[in-house]
């Protein structure tokens, strides 16, 4: 019986992927105005379907709460009228971005007279595998559509009802613009085997993008025959150098940890130069503790904070290198900049790293030597975001160096081909 079910699921996923492949072919040369019209119509459909979408989301949230998920997880899953309006606004924003398809990125003429151009083209079919983030369903569908790609969307089971309701609104936009319904498809089953069946279809799917925790990333990378571009965890560090201005240190630590702790560019570890720890740690620690952050400290940091009357607890062995996604922060005192660089090299996840310093030489060395998709100097880790960096909307933040590194916007959802023109040239 299990084998029959598996064969049925495999056939279902192949049929779904084949429809996506056909849609991708049509999207590769679709009129940009038609794609933009679909996005705007989808935004309007979300507004009209608000009651239905929020009702389905409430069912998802209730089930996740009953399953014992934590507050940060529930926050990522939850939709409300304001967040839904933000999703619709993002569709209008994406519609207003420049279409990357067909953009000439370079051109030259060879001595033999050949005219050569490099132009952007869609990747094809993109499989997006993600956890309980309903907004990703729409963001990924929209960015793939704008860049001429078909999207197969595989949300976590906790967000399936919400995602199907949002996808129905998106499908309405596609229909109104006369684009293929299979341009954006949500995998309709919570069965994990469906993901594995899709990951085997390297003849139909061009790229898989897993976005979530370590177990999700590992499962996709280990089982996939499709090229994988990882959007891995964000173990983001904030290093306070010896010359860090105390108030700036407080502001950046608070913003990085407290503003939205459940996202991948939140600060997860605070490193402090030993020579300034006595001056910097008490005000920074007090501000964080007052904001409800649990400080998990190495012995030196713990002693300094306890002496200053700031609530803190000893760090556990695995707290360094951990993505908490909650109001928890690992804290360590390091000898100097070398110590900070060594710590980040060992525990960082190639996502975002930040330094607070007045010393230009320290800032430049930090920028040179830290291996991450974004390196911040006197700025919060929260700025590693497509919109904040001026790239427009993003499908996620890649921690894989091939084919894109950092926020993935429209350009990163394309590849390039050569167009060569001659006059009967032979070699």
UniProtKB/Swiss-Prot annotation:
Protein's cellular compartments: Cytoplasm
Segments crossing the lipid bilayer: none
Keywords: Amino-acid biosynthesis, Cytoplasm, NADP, Oxidoreductase, Proline biosynthesis
GO BP of this protein: L-proline biosynthetic process
Recorded catalytic activity of this chain's protein: L-glutamate 5-semialdehyde + phosphate + NADP(+) = L-glutamyl 5-phosphate + NADPH + H(+)
Gene Ontology terms, MF aspect: glutamate-5-semialdehyde dehydrogenase activity; NADP binding
Primary location: cytoplasm
Pathway(s) per entry: Amino-acid biosynthesis; L-proline biosynthesis; L-glutamate 5-semialdehyde from L-glutamate: step 2/2
EC class of the enzyme, as a word: oxidoreductase
Disulphide linkage map: none
EC number assigned by the record: 1.2.1.41
SUPFAM superfamilies cross-referenced by the UniProt entry: ALDH-like (SSF53720)
InterPro entries: Ald_DH/histidinol_DH, Ald_DH_C, Ald_DH_N, Aldehyde_DH_dom, G-glutamylP_reductase_CS, Glu-5-SA_DH, GPR_dom
Pfam families: Aldedh
Gene Ontology terms: cellular component: cytoplasm
Family: Belongs to the gamma-glutamyl phosphate reductase family.
Stored NCBIfam families: PRK00197.1, proA
Purpose of the protein: Catalyzes the NADPH-dependent reduction of L-glutamate 5-phosphate into L-glutamate 5-semialdehyde and phosphate. The product spontaneously undergoes cyclization to form 1-pyrroline-5-carboxylate.
Name assigned to this protein: Gamma-glutamyl phosphate reductase
Gene name in the database record: proA
């Amino acid at each position: 019986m299990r084998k029959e079910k598996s064969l049925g699921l495999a056939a279902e996923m192949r049929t779904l992927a084949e429809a996506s492949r056909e849609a991708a072919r049509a999207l590769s040369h679709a009129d940009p105005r038609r794609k933009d019209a679909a996005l705007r119509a989808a935004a309007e459909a979300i507004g009209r379907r608000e009651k239905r979408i929020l009702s389905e989301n409430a069912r998802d949230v209730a089930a996740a709460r009953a399953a014992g998920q934590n507050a940060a997880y529930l926050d990522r899953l939850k939709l409300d009228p304001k967040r839904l309006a933000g999703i619709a606004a993002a569709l209008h924003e994406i519609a207003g971005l420049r279409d990357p398809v067909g953009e000439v990125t370079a051109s030259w003429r060879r001595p033999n007279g050949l005219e050569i151009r490099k132009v952007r083209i869609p990747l094809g079919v993109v499989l997006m595998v993600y956890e309980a983030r309903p907004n990703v369903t729409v963001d990924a569908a929209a960015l793939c559509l704008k860049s001429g790609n078909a999207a197969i969307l595989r949300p976590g089971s906790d967000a399936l009802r919400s995602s199907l309701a949002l996808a129905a609104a998106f499908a309405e936009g596609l229909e109104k613009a006369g684009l293929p319904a299979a341009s954006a498809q949500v995998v309709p089953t919570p069965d994990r085997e469906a993901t594995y069946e899709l990951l085997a279809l390297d003849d139909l799917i061009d790229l898989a993008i897993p976005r979530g925790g370590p177990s999700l990333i590992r499962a996709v990378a280990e089982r996939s025959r499709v090229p994988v571009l990882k959007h891995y965890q964000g173990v983001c560090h904030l290093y306070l150098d010896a010359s860090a201005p105390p108030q700036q240190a407080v502001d950046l630590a608070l913003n990085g940890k407290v503003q939205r702790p459940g996202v991948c560019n939140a600060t997860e570890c605070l490193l402090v130069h030993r020579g300034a720890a006595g001056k910097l740690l008490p005000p920074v620690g007090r501000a964080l503790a007052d904001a409800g952050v649990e400080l998990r400290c190495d012995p030196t940091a713990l002693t300094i904070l306890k002496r200053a009357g700031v609530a803190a607890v000893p760090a556990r062995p695995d707290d360094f290198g951990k993505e908490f996604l909650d109001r928890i922060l690992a804290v360590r005192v390091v000898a100097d900049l070398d110590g900070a660089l060594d710590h980040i090299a060992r525990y960082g996840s190639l996502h975002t790293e930040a330094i607070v310093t007045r010393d230009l030489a320290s800032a430049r060395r930090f920028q040179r030597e830290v291996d991450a998709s974004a390196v911040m100097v006197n700025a919060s880790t929260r700025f590693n975001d497509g919109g904040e960096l001026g790239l427009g909307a993003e499908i996620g933040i890649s921690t894989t160096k091939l084919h894109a590194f950092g926020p993935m916007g429209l350009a990163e959802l394309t590849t390039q081909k050569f167009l060569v023109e001659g006059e009967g040239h032979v070699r």
